[in-house]
């Protein structure tokens, strides 16, 4: 998968520290396209800048959307992240399997990784807009991950 074809979409990210951390993680892997859906009004604060460091350019160039459907309008395939196994969601990828799928089947396709709010994750209506689902195996006693760590 070519990094220039991949967008990271954060749905209603709440904390500028997490947003800055996501920018830094993105730059570590050459991914520079960030889309924010209804972010906190302080998403470009000094805290975000401190966490992003030189990756703050990712945040400065981020596209802002009111809803996920708009953010996905030019995306051909979306991978939604979730820790919840719904009754109709059957095909989950691990991060490694999702990376392999992106590399094998979607190399020249505009793709997105979609992550939800820190406190609730993606809602069903948002997951319904995604073609694939990713879940990260974690300890049953504490399955929720920090936004930047999930990325």
Go through each PLM region and give its residues.
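Post-transcriptional modification and biogenesis factors for structured RNAs
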Residues: 1-151
